Each structure stands twice: as structure tokens, then as C-alpha cells.
């Protein structure tokens, strides 16, 4: 990776060009402050993206990517970017779905180009390009109140139930307020089948813990209960990627955890851009390390429960 410099006084403060495998990525305004409270400039943000890339790239590879851009930093205005930003460099891979030309984030060159455009958050599709089947199952826990002190307790209860079903799972902070439970699976079941299974899990947990969980779709009707969003895991939808930075004032990062860590009740803000890469050097990629598993036996075992819930609709 090399740097071509213009006038020395300007190159270090206004722009630099990175040469990555023969592709050139211009980094503009590296001193622009993206996270004022954390003192993280665009230059530092891109440095941390490089360190996160061995983990973030596998989570996004081969998927339709939506980003959230904050041109003036996380305290400024933002917008969702679905169509590939233009002009799109020739090294950037894209894929079209429903008339939208999405970026497909397969390499570090593309990641740095997006980082320079102040793409802070990375939200990939829940399936691969041109492949309708999911490669994992995700249960999303969404608090109804900010700084929900019971979110890790709720995650632990979901994990315990999955374990009773014979399923291994990896919890991750969303990087905002919620927690997602990732269940690596062998491809086969459809999104519809996994949503039906999610409904069974969610209904059972709501029945057992009515003061903690809800599946009420309207937020105004949830009270203080934590919403089990089993509907989010679907074709055409996205979720915050593992290891993506988030646009919070404390520069949080969506971080996979061990179940032992969950029981110690960490806060999502404990994992941020200034410590995430160092942590990952110690833990590795907890999601990629978890072997994929066949979920068909669970679907078969709970078929009667799934059918009963379908009749209630």
C-alpha cells in the first residue's frame, strides 16, 4: 500500500491517494471530525476500518449492501445509500436487485472507498446475491426504552432456549441498543420456515416471561417490554453487520460476544472503534468460528407448534 503525495503541506491535511493492488483510492479531508466526542477523524476512522476489515468483509461479502452516510460526522445529517454512489470506480463490484444497483463489498479497496465517502454503517442483505436462501438465522431483540438494563438477561434467556433445542448460537450487540442472536445454519430452510420457527420461540418466551418480552409490532403498545423481532430476518431486509461501526456518540461497534460475557451484563458502548480491533485479535471472529448446523430436525420437532400458531393468524 503506497501513498502518492501532492504538495506536502496539503497532502497530509486535505487528501492522500492510496495504491492498493494497482487500484487508487483517494482519501479526502482526513482531518474532518466524524466522532467529535471520541476525537475520531475520518483518517482515524479509515485506519480502524482497515483493522476491522478481516472481520467486517466476510460478514458483507457477496451480499447486497446498504450503507448509512454521515458526510458531516455522526452529529450531522445522514442518509441511506442503496444505489452504488456515483461515480463508481471500476474496481467496485455491484449487483442489481429490484432495480437498485447495490455495492457488493468484497474487498478492502471498496471498503476504503466507502469509508472515504463517510459510509459509517454497513448493513448487508440477509442472503447472498442471486441466492434466495439464508445462510444464518437471526433473532433480533429490540428494547422499547433506551439503556435497557435487562437486554443481556433477555439475550441469555433466548440463548438458553436455543440450547434446549440443540442449537448453538452467538449473541452480538447491535452497536446501538439491541442484541441479535446469530444461529449459523447449513443452507436449506427458507426465510418463511425460519420466521415460523422464530414465531414459536418468541411466543414461548413471551408466555414464560410476560413482563420482559413482547411480539407486539406497534412500539406504542409494547410498554417497556423487549420486542422479539423474528420478522426482520427476511429476504430483501438488512441488519447491522457484525463488526460494523455505528453512528453513536461513543463510536460503538456491533460486537459478537461469548455467552459468559453476556452473563456479565456488558453495555453495547463498551465495544467501540478505539478498542474493537484489539479485542478481535484476542477473540477472533466468534461467528465464523461457530460451525454451521442443520436446523431441519428442529423444524420437524416443532412442526405441530408451528401449525398451531399458523391457525391462530
Model-based region annotation:
Residues 56-72, 78:
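Short N-terminal amphipathic alpha-helices
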Residues 1-40, 44-46, 57, 61-62, ...:
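C-terminal accessory nucleic-acid interaction domains of nucleic acid-metabolism proteins
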